[in-house]
Amino acid sequence: MQAKRLINRKQSGFTLIEVMVVIVILGILAVLVVPNVLGRADKAKVDSTKLALSNVAGALDQYKVDNGHYPTPAEGGLEALVKQPESVKNWVPGGYLKGGYPKDSWENNLQYNQPGSEGRSYDLYSFGADGKPGGEGLDADIYYSEQ
């Protein structure tokens, strides 16, 4: 009878402990990185909405220079910046805003009230991420305030 010889082979691959250590490290990195990345995306949407409000405010000011008043509800409000109201004679060909009715970063229509509250000529704002009045955090209304 021949004796069976055991052959030692070099094992390749990772041990269970090595795999678990890598998973723990990846979990820790995810906990640290993901909130920062998500927070930046949310801040970018708020900043983009503020920029859109500022651009619309500039268009409203130009409308006032051309027509002597800000768009009224009877003229369609912000719609008067993209489509000429019948009663307006000094409207800029092509409109005051390119790209249609203005929207915020969440694709909700911007809000416009004329006359505005607290003695302002108008109120220009976004309802925030939820598209509803009020709210907190990302859902809070974002007002244009440089009037």
Feature roles, as predicted:
Residues 40-86:
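Conserved hydrophobic/amphipathic alpha-helical signal-anchor segments
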Residues 4, 46-47, 58-61, 65-67, ...:
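Short, surface-exposed interaction loops/tails
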Residues 70, 97, 142:
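Short clusters of hydrophobic/aromatic residues that line enzyme substrate/ligand-binding pockets
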Residues 11-37:
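N-terminal single-pass transmembrane signal-anchor helix
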Residues 89-104:
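Short acidic, Pro/Gly- and aromatic-enriched capping/linker segments at domain boundaries
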Residues 1-14:
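N-terminal leader/signal peptides at the extreme start of proteins
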